[in-house]
Amino acid sequence: MTNDVIKLTDLNKEDIPADLRAETYFDFKAHPFEHQELFEQTNSVYGAILAIHEYAAKWLVDIIGQKRSSARVFKNKTPPRFAAQAGAGAAHTIGNFEVLLQDGAIFEPAWVIGSLKDNLRHSIYVAEGAKIIGANIYLENGSMYIGSQTTIEPGVGIKGPIIIGKGTEVRQGAYLRGDCIIGDGCTIRGEIKNSCLMNKANFPHPSYLGDSLCGYMTHFGNQATTANLGIFAGLVEPAKRKALIIKCNGKAYDLGKPKMGVCMGDYSQLGCNCVTDPGTFLKPYTISYALARISKGFYGPNEILKNKPLEHGIIERSPYKPEFSQKTEDRI
């Protein structure tokens, strides 16, 4: 392997190795995704992670502007009628914010925390049939879009900027720390920051996901966690941390930033209590057994991963045939 380190951000899209391209992990033709543009406007999957904030902020401005004329708008207050019907007091509110509700939406948060700056106001748009009950809404740093028929349960903490699609369930205990794009039909409970989860992604248990991408129908088992910063890098002051380096096809690539979690291709799964190192790439249909520690690098597609018992640092890798499991499922 050459000693030269290539800066990923300096490469044109056509010069990016296949293992770092979006099409290696996500089949948007088979599984269309509303925010596919995030990947089209960046040169690599890691470039997409870096672009989440900017993309989400711009998309929110555009879509909320389009929806404004058809929604009921409340500035620095929450609509009173739902709280009155329940016999409860109004939500606690602080600062400047804006609520846009479509007919049939229910907005009964516990707290709404807006900007303390007089010249700054972010918005939350709640589509028809969506329900937000007992959640803590933080609009200090960005706006929010909550898609139709999505439910956000009591006890959820959610910070903007964030986009949540249609028919998604955000369960009690979830902590969404901002810069999140979550697709349609997802189930969410753990802690998420700066990540994109595509349609039908399942993150339904106490877990952590940061600086990551999760494709169509990916799944996290209970307590599965993605480390996004090396354990020794955590001992270094943030300004002095070095960028993460990934080895790919005999070359070393400087990602430009010290943090990255996991890139999970369509249908990939992490078993219960599995941990991935910063900079782990799982191609489609890659499945990790429970209690595995997955070192950074590239795995799959169509592969099963597990740690070898009683041996240090060994990952067993076996072929996986998706068509077999699908046929088996059809017979049950």
Listing of model-derived features with the role each one plays in the protein:
Residues 125, 146, 154, 263, ...:
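Ordered hydrophobic segments in well-structured contexts
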Residues 125, 131-133, 138, 145, ...:
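Extracellular beta-strand solenoid repeats
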Residues 1-129, 285, 291, 300-332:
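Terminal amphipathic alpha-helical/low-complexity segments used for targeting or macromolecular assembly
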Residues 43, 142-156, 240-241, 245, ...:
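Short, charge-rich amphipathic segments
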